[in-house]
């Protein structure tokens, strides 16, 4: 035991003294937005190894793995105490088999295991944070077989965010195991301006709440519905791309909104090239929820290799139109109805022109024709004809355009 302890401490010391100025994240990860599941939205602190194993099982049997989801992420409250040498331990009551055994189980399913920590002394739920233990924790995670680290921002009043996140990035890289690094700084310090070389994604807002258009006051902080989070993405699309994504938070599909709201929520997250991290109970979700979360054509828009975040193309108040360039000259177009009533909408393509200064795409619809397919109901048509659609209240119509 003593020999193993000295070896472990020696490895940590070696990591600390060998940090290079060119330290980097693992560049081969998140070339498209990551897809997975996270425990927080539904379970909060009520997590244990039995439930996590069941979620891994459900991700496979529900068809979510086949649809592209791969990460099973444990959020806050898995932590026990640090041992006398500062190494973090899993809560032995709720994770009696240990994290290595849990990771082995998840890996045997063809999935990956994610874990949570915090840049401060304590996590948001008061468990041990990683401040001052970054290299120890990264080495521990690597030894457990962890594949994903979500790094939160509680208890950080006197910490520089860029430095704090860079330190954990360096620690993960030095630990030697590729781990996706998810920055959860809530957008308070504009991580999009400095985090491209630090993490694979960064949160752009505070926490999500399962509502269409609300701000939920928790006292000292607020959480936000679908539309407020969408609106906070204005001006951020230029920062997104393969390996570095604007993260709009875990999804609330299946957690109490209407079917149309869930479909719109999922479609918008896909268009904005946000990570698609489910936040519902995978074990008992409805067929409708499963159909939304595994919708092949929507996921294809999110996972398009160009990695271009959609732009708001046209704004007519309650009716907004988003467009996203895709591979092979294709485009995805989303009509969003923010209002409480359904809307009949007439759209003459020939009157419209699209120019995207960021991705350098442009379309003259009076000169270039596309065939379109409504990805949610299968209807087809052409941009040579006037489009007449009914956009549901709190809903979307999504078309995929392909060159004629």
Swiss-Prot record:
Substrate binds at residues 185-189. Its EC number is 3.2.1.22. Optimum temperature is 50 degrees Celsius. Displays half maximal activity in 25 minutes and 7 minutes when pre-incubated at 50 degrees Celsius and 55 degrees Celsius, respectively. The keyword Nucleus does not apply. The active site is at 152 (nucleophile), 207 (proton donor). Optimum pH is 8.2. One of its GO terms (molecular function) is alpha-galactosidase activity. Keywords: Disulfide bond, Glycosidase, Hydrolase, Signal. GO terms for biological process: galactomannan catabolic process. It comes from the Bacteria. Belongs to the glycosyl hydrolase 27 family. This is Alpha-galactosidase A. It comes from Cellvibrio japonicus (strain Ueda107) (Pseudomonas fluorescens subsp. cellulosa).
């Amino acid at each position: 035991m003593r020999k193993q302890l000295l070896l472990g401490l020696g490895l940590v010391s070696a990591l600390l003294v060998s940090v290079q100025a060119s330290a980097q994240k693992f560049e081969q990860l998140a070339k498209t937005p990551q897809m997975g599941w996270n425990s927080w939205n539904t379970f909060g602190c009520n997590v244990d190894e039995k439930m996590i194993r069941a979620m891994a099982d459900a991700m496979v049997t529900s068809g979510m793995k086949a649809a592209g989801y791969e990460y099973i992420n444990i959020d806050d409250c898995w932590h026990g105490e640090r041992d006398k040498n500062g190494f973090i331990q899993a809560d032995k009551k709720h994770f009696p088999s240990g994290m290595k055994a849990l990771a082995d189980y998840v890996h045997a399913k063809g999935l990956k295991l994610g874990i949570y920590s915090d840049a401060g002394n304590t996590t948001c739920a008061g468990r041990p944070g990683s401040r001052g233990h970054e290299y120890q924790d990264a080495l521990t995670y690597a030894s457990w077989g962890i594949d994903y680290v979500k790094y939160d921002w509680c208890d950080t009043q006197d910490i520089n965010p860029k430095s704090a996140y860079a330190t954990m990035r360096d620690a993960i890289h030095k630990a030697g195991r590729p781990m996706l690094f998810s920055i959860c700084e809530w957008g308070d310090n504009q991580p999009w301006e400095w985090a491209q070389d630090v993490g694979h994604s960064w949160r752009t807002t505070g926490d999500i709440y399962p509502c269409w258009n609300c701000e939920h006051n928790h006292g000292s902080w607020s959480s936000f519905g679908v539309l407020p989070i969408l609106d906070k993405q204005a001006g951020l699309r230029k920062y997104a791309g393969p390996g570095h994504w604007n993260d709009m938070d875990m999804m609330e599909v299946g957690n109490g909104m209407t079917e149309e709201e869930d479909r719109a929520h999922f479609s918008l997250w896909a268009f904005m090239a946000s990570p698609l991290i489910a936040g519902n109970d995978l074990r008992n979700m409805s067929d409708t929820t499963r159909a939304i979360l595994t919708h092949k054509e929507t996921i294809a828009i999110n996972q398009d290799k160009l990695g271009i975040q959609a732009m708001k193309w046209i704004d007519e108040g309650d009716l907004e139109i988003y467009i996203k360039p895709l591979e092979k000259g294709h485009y995805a177009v989303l009509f969003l109805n923010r209002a409480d009533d359904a809307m009949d909408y007439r759209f003459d393509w020939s009157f419209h022109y699209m120019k995207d200064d960021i991705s350098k795409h442009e379309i003259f619809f009076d000169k270039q024709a596309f065939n379109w397919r409504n990805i949610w109901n299968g209807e087809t048509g052409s941009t040579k004809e006037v489009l007449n659609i009914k956009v549901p209240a709190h809903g979307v119509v999504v078309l995929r355009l392909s060159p004629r």
